[in-house]
């Protein structure tokens, strides 16, 4: 056989194989596509590539992370996703930034203050990855007032007028006085109690990003991130699962919370979910 005969086998180019057709030209009411009978080798090669991309996106989207895609491939996949209205798993993922109860200095627990950059950056991450919502958890009335003012400025005020992209991100922001309130918000939105998952830099989590992705297929998930020195034990104990720490093999893994959120969302959802 020809040396190139295996070039288009499944997995050979990091993609699943395109469908094959043979005689008769119509079998069980399925005709051979016109392009394959055209004799135009360029069109045939393009059709085969697009079919491989489409099949991989539908069946094994995880393979696209390592596939050598061209700019044309990426544009085709974007158009395919938009045309199909493909369900993005991110719609079932919700995150919450917990300001109470969290560890402060000297292993005491209490409440932390809102950080403007955290709210901005996590809202933008949430919109970029297509999350269902982003809830800021704080019981402090003055902090709630600050958050309400911030959200109003970027959604209804001059901030939203001058920066529509930021307004779109801030449209996902919600507020709750405690974690139970955040759970209630997701349940009211989705009609289901979310799976509650925690995150921690300490070595008390074993759940993988793939396990979270599997849950998102048919369940809402609320992913908690702590401020200060991490969430208090009573919050983590109430979780249905805890993700294993980022950089868990290294001794130093003290990431800023907005960095941890961005990395975690990317590991769970990647480019295709």
Labelled PLM ranges:
Residues 27, 40-43, 202-205, 228-231, ...:
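Short Gly/Pro-enriched loop/turn and capping motifs at secondary-structure junctions
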Residues 197-235:
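Long, charge-patterned amphipathic alpha-helical coiled-coil/hairpin "stalk" segments used as oligomerization
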Residues 28, 86-90, 189-190, 213-217, ...:
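Solvent-exposed alpha-helices and their adjacent loops that cap or buttress functional pockets
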Residues 131, 193, 219, 239-240:
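Short, well-ordered alpha-helix to beta-strand connector turns
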Residues 1-84:
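Non-catalytic terminal and connector segments of soluble metabolic enzymes
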Residues 88-200, 262-273:
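RNA substrate-binding interface of SAM-dependent RNA methyltransferases
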Residues 1, 229-273:
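Structured adenosyl-cofactor binding patch, chiefly the S-adenosyl-L-methionine
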């Amino acid at each position: 056989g020809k040396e190139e005969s295996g070039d288009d086998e499944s997995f050979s180019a990091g993609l699943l194989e395109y469908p094959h057709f043979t005689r008769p030209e119509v079998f069980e009411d399925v005709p051979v596509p016109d392009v394959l009978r055209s004799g135009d080798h360029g069109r045939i090669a393009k059709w085969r590539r697009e079919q491989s991309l489409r099949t991989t996106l539908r069946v094994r989207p995880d393979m696209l992370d390592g596939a050598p895609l061209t700019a044309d491939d990426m544009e085709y996949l974007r158009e395919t996703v938009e045309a199909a209205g493909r369900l993005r798993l991110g719609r079932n993922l919700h995150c919450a930034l917990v300001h109470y109860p969290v560890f402060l200095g000297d292993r005491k627990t209490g409440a932390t203050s809102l950080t403007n950059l955290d709210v901005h950056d996590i809202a933008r991450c949430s919109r970029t990855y297509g999350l269902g919502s982003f809830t800021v958890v704080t019981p402090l009335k003055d902090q709630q007032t600050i958050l309400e003012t911030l959200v109003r400025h970027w959604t209804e005020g001059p901030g939203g007028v001058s920066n529509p992209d930021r307004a779109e991100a801030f449209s996902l922001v919600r507020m709750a006085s405690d974690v139970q309130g955040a759970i209630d918000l997701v349940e009211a939105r989705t009609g289901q109690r979310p799976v509650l998952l925690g995150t921690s830099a300490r070595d008390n989590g074993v759940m993988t990003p793939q396990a979270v992705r599997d849950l998102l297929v048919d369940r809402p998930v609320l992913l908690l991130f702590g401020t200060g020195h991490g969430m208090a034990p009573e919050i983590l104990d109430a979780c249905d699962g805890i993700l294993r720490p980022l950089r868990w093999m290294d001794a130093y893994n003290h990431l800023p919370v907005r960095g941890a959120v961005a990395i975690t969302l990317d590991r769970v959802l990647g480019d295709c979910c």
